[in-house]
From Swiss-Prot:
It holds the Pfam family DALR_1. One of its GO terms (cellular component) is cytoplasm. It comes from Bartonella henselae (strain ATCC 49882 / DSM 28221 / CCUG 30454 / Houston 1). GO terms for biological process: arginyl-tRNA aminoacylation. Signal peptide: none annotated. It catalyses: tRNA(Arg) + L-arginine + ATP = L-arginyl-tRNA(Arg) + AMP + diphosphate. This is Arginine--tRNA ligase. GO terms for molecular function: arginine-tRNA ligase activity; ATP binding. Monomer. Keywords: Aminoacyl-tRNA synthetase, ATP-binding, Cytoplasm, Ligase, Nucleotide-binding, Protein biosynthesis. CDD domains: ArgRS_core.
Length: 585
C-alpha cells in the first residue's frame, strides 16, 4: 500500500465530486496534484500541493482554495488534523489507528511489501557492462555494472520481465591488438626476450598465463605456421580466456547476465545481419552515398575525404549523418551497433535500456536516431551514463595495478573490501555524478559508512528477537501474537518509524519511474538512521526499549515494528544484491 498515492487518489476523488470547478465551470485538470512527505516531519505526515496547482484554473487564492479542500477532507476517519501552511500547501496528520493498521498490513505482506504491480510482464532489455574482452574488468566498469544490475532487479521486483544482456565487442581492431599482445607473451613463454612491451599493445601481466598456456599446448608451432592462421587461433583463445576472466570478475560482484551477445554474430554469413539492416534502412530512405565535412577540431577514423555510404541520421534527431560503409567497403563500428539494435528490436522488447560510461555521452544521439529509424519511432529507448569512479585510501589517490598494466581492477577492489560494500557504495551517488570511493571509509564501522550502518540496523533487529526469546521465554514468536497487540504502538517515536517504513513503496515507485536505483540506497540508509536514533533513545529512556519484561503485550507490539523494519531492510538489500546481516562480527 502506497499511503501517498492512496491519499492522492482520495483527494482527487473528493475534488471530482465537489463543486470546486474551473473559472468557466469546467472540470479541473488534477494530474499535477501530488502527495508527499513534508520536508519538515513536525509539520505533519502528508503534504499536498493540490491548492497550489489548481489555484490559477479556479481563479482562487491558493490559501482560500486550500481551505475549501480542507473542508472536503477533514471528516475522513483517518485524518487527525489538517491545516494550511505557507503559500497554500496542505499538511495532514493521520490518526494512530491508521498507522497501526498500516503496520499490520506490512506484516501480513512480509517481504512483498512495496512490490507494486507496475510491470505487468512487459519485457525490458537492460544492456550493461559490455566491456571489451581485452583484459580484466577495471573499477571504471564497476559502477555501470552495479547500476545496471540493481536497476534490473528493481524492475523485476515490480513485475517487469527483464533480460540482462552483455554485448561482447569481439570483432574490432582491439581484438587484433589483443592477439598480437598475447603472441608477444607466447614468445616470452618460449624463452624469447621481449624487453619493453611495444606501444599500442596491452602491457598487463594478466596475459602472461595465456602465453604460457599456448606455449605448453603448441610449443613453437604458432611461430612456424601461416601468420594469419596463428593469429586466428590466438584470437579465439584470447577472447575465450578474457570473457572467462570477465565472467569471474562479475560473479565476484554477484552479477550474472542472461545473454552474452557476440559482435561476431553480426559479421557471420558475410555480415548478413549488417547487410539486412542497411537494406532495411535503404527501403525507408535513410541511406545515401555522399561525403561528410571534416569534423571540427578532431580526427575520427570514420571520416574520409571521399564518397561513403551514409545513414541520414539527422532526419531522426542526430547532430550529423553517420558513416555505415567506408570507401573501401568495410563496415564501421556504428554499422554493427545499428544491426545489434535491430536484433534487439526484432526480439520484441517493450523497452531497451543502455547503461554506458560517461565517455559515451557523444553516442547518445546516434543511438536514439538509429532506434527511431529502425523501429519507425516505435521503440522505447533509455540511455543512462555513469560518471567516473575515483579511488582513494585515507583521502589519497590509489596507485594503478601492475597486474592490469594501467588501471585498478574490479577484482582488486572486491577482494579487499568485499562485494557488498562495493555494490552499495556504487549506488550511493546519482550515476551522473562523479563518485569517490575510499577504501578506508567503506571498511570503517561508523555511521559514515552507509553499508555498515544499514547492515548494523539489520543485525540489531535480529538481536532484539534473540533477546525476546530469552527474556519472554518464547521459542517462536508468531505473527498472530504480534498483530494482536499492534494497538499498543502509540509513542510518537514508534509512529515516526512506521511513517518511515510507509515511504518504501513510494521510493520503489519513484526509483522505477525515474530509473534511479540510487534512491533505494539513500532510503535504506535513512531508514537505518531513524532506527538507530530510536535505539539510542532507549539508552536514556528505558520505557522506549523494544523489550519490556514487565509488559509482554507491548513487547510483542514492538517486535512487530522490528519485524517490519527487518522485512524492508531485507527486501531493499536483496534488490541491491546484498544479503541482510543477522549479526555483526
Amino acid at each position: 500500500m502506497n499511503v501517498f498515492k492512496n491519499f492522492e487518489k482520495k483527494i482527487k476523488k473528493s475534488l471530482e465530486s465537489s463543486d470546486i470547478k474551473g473559472k468557466n465551470g469546467e472540470d479541473l485538470d488534477l494530474s499535477k496534484i501530488t502527495v508527499d512527505p513534508p520536508r519538515d516531519s513536525s509539520h505533519g505526515h502528508l503534504s499536498t500541493n493540490a491548492a497550489m496547482v489548481l489555484a490559477k484554473s479556479t481563479g482562487l487564492n491558493p490559501r482560500a482554495l486550500a481551505e475549501k479542500i480542507i473542508e472536503l477532507l477533514k471528516n475522513d476517519p483517518s485524518v487527525e488534523s489538517i491545516n494550511v501552511a505557507g503559500p497554500g500547501f496542505i499538511n495532514i496528520k493521520l490518526t494512530k489507528p491508521f498507522w497501526q493498521d498500516l503496520i499490520k498490513s506490512m506484516l501480513e505482506k512480509g517481504i512483498s511489501y512495496g512490490r507494486i504491480p507496475m510491470g505487468q510482464g512487459k519485457r525490458i532489455n537492460v544492456e550493461y557492462v559490455s566491456a571489451n574482452p581485452t583484459g580484466p574488468m577495471h573499477v571504471g566498469h564497476c559502477r555501470g555494472a552495479v547500476v545496471g544490475d540493481v536497476l534490473s532487479n528493481l524492475l523485476q521486483f515490480v513485475g517487469y520481465n527483464i533480460t540482462k544482456e552483455y554485448y561482447i565487442n569481439d570483432a574490432g581492431k582491439q581484438i587484433e591488438v589483443l592477439a598480437h599482445s598475447v603472441l608477444l607473451r607466447y614468445r616470452e613463454a618460449l624463452g624469447q626476450k621481449i624487453n619493453e612491451i611495444p606501444e599500442g599493445l596491452y602491457p598487463g601481466e594478466y596475459l602472461i598465463p595465456l602465453g604460457q598456456s599456448l606455449a605448453q599446448e603448441f610449443g613453437d608451432k604458432l611461430l612456424t605456421i601461416d601468420k594469419e592462421e596463428a593469429l586466428s587461433i590466438v584470437k579465439e583463445r584470447a577472447i575465450h580466456e578474457m570473457m572467462s576472466m570477465i565472467r569471474k570478475d562479475l560473479a565476484a560482484l554477484n552479477i550474472y547476465h542472461d545473454i552474452f551477445f557476440s559482435e561476431r554474430m553480426l559479421y557471420a554469413d558475410n555480415a548478413r545481419a549488417i547487410r539486412n539492416t542497411i537494406n532495411d534502412l535503404t527501403l525507408k530512405g535513410y541511406i545515401y552515398k555522399g561525403k561528410l565535412p571534416p569534423p571540427k577540431g578532431q580526427n575520427t577514423e570514420d571520416w574520409e575525404p571521399c564518397e561513403q555510404t551514409l545513414f541520414r541520421s539527422t532526419d531522426v534527431g542526430d547532430d550529423q549523418d553517420r558513416v555505415l560503409i567506408k570507401s573501401d567497403g568495410s563496415y564501421t563500428y556504428f554499422a554493427a551497433d545499428v544491426a545489434y539494435f535491430r536484433d534487439k528490436f526484432n526480439r520484441h522488447f517493450d523497452e531497451m535500456i543502455y547503461i554506458l560510461g560517461a565517455d559515451h555521452a557523444g553516442y547518445v544521439k546516434r543511438l536514439e536516431a538509429m532506434a527511431k529509424a529502425i523501429s519507425n519511432d516505435k521503440a522505447k529507448l533509455s540511455v543512462f551514463l555513469c560518471q567516473l569512479v575515483k579511488l582513494f585510501r585515507n583521502g589519497h589517490p590509489v596507485r594503478m595495478s601492475k597486474r592490469a598494466g594501467s588501471f585498478v581492477t574490479l577484482r582488486d577492489v572486491v577482494e579487499e573490501v568485499g562485494s557488498d560494500p562495493v555494490r552499495f557504495m556504487m549506488l550511493y551517488r546519482k550515476c551522473e555524478a562523479p563518485l569517490d570511493f575510499d577504501f578506508a571509509k567503506v571498511t570503517e564501522q561508523s555511521k559514515d559508512n552507509p553499508i555498515f550502518y544499514v547492515q548494523y540496523a539489520s543485525a540489531r533487529c535480529h538481536s532484539v528477537f534473540r533477546q525476546a526469546q530469552e527474556t519472554l521465554c518464547i521459542e517462536n514468536i508468531s505473527n498472530d501474537k504480534i498483530i494482536e497487540h499492534l494497538n499498543r504502538l502509540t509513542d510518537d517515536n514508534e509512529i515516526f518509524l512506521i511513517r518511515k517504513l510507509s515511504e518504501y513503496p513510494r521510493i520503489i515507485e519513484q526509483a522505477v519511474v525515474h530509473k534511479e536505483p540510487h534512491r533505494l540506497a539513500f532510503y535504506l540508509y535513512d531508514l537505518a538512521s531513524s532506527f538507530h536514533t530510536h535505539w539510542n533513545k532507549g539508552s536514556d529512556n528505558l520505557n522506549l526499549r523494544f523489550i519490556q519484561p514487565d509488559d509482554r503485550n507491548l513487547s510483542f507490539a514492538r517486535l512487530g515494528l522490528i519485524q517490519a523494519i527487518m522485512n524492508i531492510l531485507s527486501s531493499g538489500l536483496a534488490i541491491v544484491g546484498i544479503k541482510a546481516a543477522t549479526e555483526m562480527r
